[in-house]
């Protein structure tokens, strides 16, 4: 029988300069308030203002950015957390589960995990991710790392190519190639808060954004017991020691997830489904009337008291009652959002409570809103309509293709930095400018100080005498480039690409 005690999970210590001694309820809450301040005031949150949700480079302020989306997710996460705590209180289980003095931190961790959940996303969202991964795959050919004979290996980076008689180094080469070809926004988020920005958040707060538990260098299929939790890469080779320590501090078994992350995930699922449809109406991709008919058609036949009738039809009818004095669009989405939240939030909260033993252990291998219920079907309805009528719209597809080209082009522009021999690049890092490398010097100067320092620190910890040194140095050099380009906003990436391609007016 699993003993559920959240005092063992809500760890308020930090990696550096951690508070010591036994803390009162108020003192622990203050520690998490410090986390809130660090997160809300971070540049990574501010950059979300100019990162896309669905429509890249959008000038209409009514259409969501990653920041406005994240604020909405934060509110839904708070709602779910409060609902869970309220239900546990009604059952006199708060003290039993060690939450009687941790309700404030519980809510705060969920809220800030929601606010941070997208900070690692590159410009142009999933198409930015795809561009980064495709560019590196075309050079590193990670699938060839299993090839026999070794001469079949097509990797164009000589020091990462497999070599006869070097099995230990070959295993590292395989890991590095796989890792670099699996850039992922969630894994980059972990790298941002720990390695790049050194936010020194509490262990519990970082645990809240470790959405997937698969390392980026993983090869083959994940175990069936964790196939959902390991659906995508959750962290990179560069953060492996930190994640190992995180698991220890949060009492997490290998490939297990922190309990409050399920709440963040549910809040994101609820928020973006309605928001994407509302943004599509704002962009005139379809009208409210057309959206209603799309939803009606996709759901199919239903009875009067069905969930569809209670949520979608109810919103439609109410919006028309007030249509004389208010915008039908605004009214419809207000009621649709309220109705959706009032149904899905209690369901998510109850699913959390019903599966608390597995969730506490970190092994619940599903999303909270992934079941055979009508609530899950409603969420799928929103997603399917958006997929069919929004994401496949010519304007959206054109912008995504442009975004893909921009990110691919920027990587190609900065490729000379990856082509430099180790000794020359080390000299460039030290002196910042070399006359014999005018192009590389100018490109290096453009990299942000934060990213350069992260590279210098990582390489400085390596033993230069080790045979692994050239491989790992190149790995961190590639990370430097991925960090810089993924940290750009959509607009900055677009402008930088135009400037460097000499297409600016």
UniProtKB/Swiss-Prot annotation:
Its EC number is 3.1.5.1. CDD domains: HDc. It comes from the Bacteria. It is an enzyme of class 3 (hydrolase). It catalyses: dGTP + H2O = 2'-deoxyguanosine + triphosphate + H(+). Keywords: Hydrolase, Magnesium. The gene is dgt. This is Deoxyguanosinetriphosphate triphosphohydrolase. PANTHER family: DEOXYGUANOSINETRIPHOSPHATE TRIPHOSPHOHYDROLASE, DEOXYNUCLEOSIDE TRIPHOSPHATE TRIPHOSPHOHYDROLASE. Its cofactor is Mg(2+). It comes from Escherichia fergusonii (strain ATCC 35469 / DSM 13698 / CCUG 18766 / IAM 14443 / JCM 21226 / LMG 7866 / NBRC 102419 / NCTC 12128 / CDC 0568-73). Homotetramer. Residues 66-273 form the HD domain. dGTPase preferentially hydrolyzes dGTP over the other canonical NTPs.
